[in-house]
Amino acid sequence: MKSNIVLLINPWIYDFAAYDFWIKPVGLLSIGYYLEKYGYQTYLIDCLDRFHPFNPVVKNKKYGTGKFIRTPVEKPEILKHVPRKYCRYGMPIESFLKALSQIPEPDVILVTSWMTYWYQGPQFAIKILKEKFPHLPIV
């Protein structure tokens, strides 16, 4: 039986640098608003939410900006020549998995992305989601 639960995911950023200048998934939040308006129950996991309760405490700059939590990762082949560290920015994987375990099983999962260049964030999130919910549609 369908429960009309939708999980919304704003995934990590993979890049050489990223900084939180009030980055919020406005498009995804708008979709969530309309889904709730029409009777769906929504849950949001924002991997870029520096203040998520499962994350380590982060320092805040003036006006709420600040550094994302970052985890060094291997560079894609095409970027190996760039002499800079390549990182996954956003919540630790353990925090993501804990957040997933705290919500009821959804009927569908929606994953967003800020730009094509950051494809690795959605790709990694979808990989984890397919392992946890192999039978669910992921859009």
Feature locations, PLM:
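A short, structured N-terminal alpha-helical element that caps or precedes a catalytic domain
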Residues: 1-139
